């Protein structure tokens, strides 16, 4: 269990510097957007725009999915600093944002509300044509509730793009076999938890991975809530996976030798596909609500 990327520690450091002075006097508007007077120190140290809190390549993949689709209203939750929202806005979409820590948001001109994916988000039913929810499900207490909210908030035929750490690629399977945990879901000692709490200025949820979710669980929750998968993607290829090719070949041979009905029942071909078995750190799923 760790912060996803170094930017999270950078953001947390800025918060530590400014938290007591800025949040004590910041004004909050009715949309839940935190703002500051002109003579007030920055809410976050440094005068810069939003930076991606996800791994490199993830936003590129999401934009590649969205660009061919009709323009519409998108909810980005969790939104982080607003880096993905900025790119979707530039692509012509009407973007709304939501995050458990809305004070992190840095994108001007876009609505930001505070909300928890484990609860009820502050929007009316069927408000959105699209929802992007990247690197959020693994951090929350109740992923099933998040899928119910996706269903409630999307219009019929709406698109959902989600991402989680890929715990089912060949490298992570080996780590689980050898150590009993994966790269993204390590055991946490009391000292580790205290360090995360300090480094992330008390906002533990942005760092702690609480729920490992594999492809099987994602597909189950999607189908249970009326979604049909349109595509499965990886954020990038991992350079060292060639070391596992003999095992990958064996897995795929065993898959081909499995009777067709059992392969279909157990999603064997999907679990042996490149995005899952040879995926990078993150798996991305695009689905449509029927």
Region locations from a protein language model:
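Conserved class I S-adenosyl-L-methionine
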Residues: 15-69
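S-adenosyl-L-methionine-dependent methyltransferase catalytic module, highlighting the catalytic core
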Residues: 40, 44, 48-53, 57, ...
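Conserved SAM-binding loop
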Residues: 60-176, 283-290
């Amino acid at each position: 269990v760790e912060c996803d990327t170094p930017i999270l520690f950078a953001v947390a450091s800025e918060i530590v510097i400014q938290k007591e002075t800025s949040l004590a006097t910041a004004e909050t508007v009715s949309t839940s957007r935190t703002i500051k007077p002109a003579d007030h120190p920055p809410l976050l140290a440094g005068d810069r725009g939003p930076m991606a809190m996800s791994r490199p390549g993830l936003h590129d993949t999401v934009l590649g999915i969205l660009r061919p689709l009709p323009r519409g209203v998108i909810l980005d939750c969790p939104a982080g600093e607003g880096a993905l929202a900025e790119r979707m806005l530039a692509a012509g979409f009407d973007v709304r944002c939501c995050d458990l820590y809305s004070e992190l948001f840095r994108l001007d001109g876009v609505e930001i509300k505070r909300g928890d994916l484990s609860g009820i988000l502050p929007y009316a039913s069927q408000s959105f044509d699209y929802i992007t929810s990247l690197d959020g499900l693994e951090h929350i207490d109740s992923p099933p509730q998040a899928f119910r909210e996706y269903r409630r908030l999307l219009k019929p035929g709406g698109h959902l793009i989600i991402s989680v750490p890929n715990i089912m690629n060949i490298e992570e399977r080996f780590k689980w076999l050898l150590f009993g945990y994966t790269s993204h879901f390590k055991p946490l000692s009391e000292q580790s938890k205290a360090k995360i709490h300090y480094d992330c200025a008390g906002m533990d949820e942005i760092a702690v991975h609480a729920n490992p979710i594999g492809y099987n669980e994602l597909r189950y929750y999607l189908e249970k809530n009326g979604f049909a998968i349109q595509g499965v993607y990886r954020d990038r290829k991992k350079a060292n996976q060639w070391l596992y090719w003999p095992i990958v070949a064996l897995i795929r041979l065993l898959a081909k030798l499995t009777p067709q009905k059992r392969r279909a029942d157990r999603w064997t071909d999907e679990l042996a596909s490149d995005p899952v078995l040879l995926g990078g750190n993150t798996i991305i799923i695009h689905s449509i609500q029927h």
